[in-house]
Amino acid sequence: MTKINFRSCLPYAIALIIFILIAYIYASPVLEGKIINQADISSYQGAAKERDDYKKQTGEESFWTNSMFSGMPTTMIGAHYKGNYLETIYNHLFWGPRPASYLILTFVSFFLLLLAMGINVRLSIVGALAFGLCAYNFQILQVGHNSKMVAIALMPMVLSLIHISEPTRL
């Protein structure tokens, strides 16, 4: 049986601690139970109210709403489908309250990309922080473009997996 050299894991543990600390320092109001008032999320809540009320009354999922555009399917405003196993995986990607969890995922994802490309750990930490703390990320978080933030957060991880599987392609 091989022994784990914990000393070699230390830089990566330090990186994760740095990412968590910076995310929660930036988003410290979430530790007090506060949330960002995101305009798109407020609009979504208004659009989904009829669907949510129907589910509370009947216990069934509604796939149509009359409250938007004289009627439309609820697929874009949060219809839930049986057998959607990816939603469970998706929900486990985020540790703690949002937006801190979005930032942590963004930091870790870009950190892994830089490591996969052969960049040393210290520069990978700096690069991950620069990528995660860019102004655009905060703009889209403020207005409620959460799915766009998740796409930005996960893309470096996808690229790192492509690079690992086929190093000559990236």
Residue ranges: model-predicted function:
Residues 1-27, 163:
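Start-transfer (signal-anchor) and selected internal transmembrane alpha helices
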Residues 8-16, 103, 124, 148:
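Residue-level signature of transmembrane alpha-helical entry/exit and packing/kink sites
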Residues 154, 158:
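Catalytic or ion-translocation cores adjacent to nucleophile or general acid/base/metal-coordination motifs
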Residues 160-170:
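Residue-level detector of conserved catalytic or cofactor/ligand-binding positions
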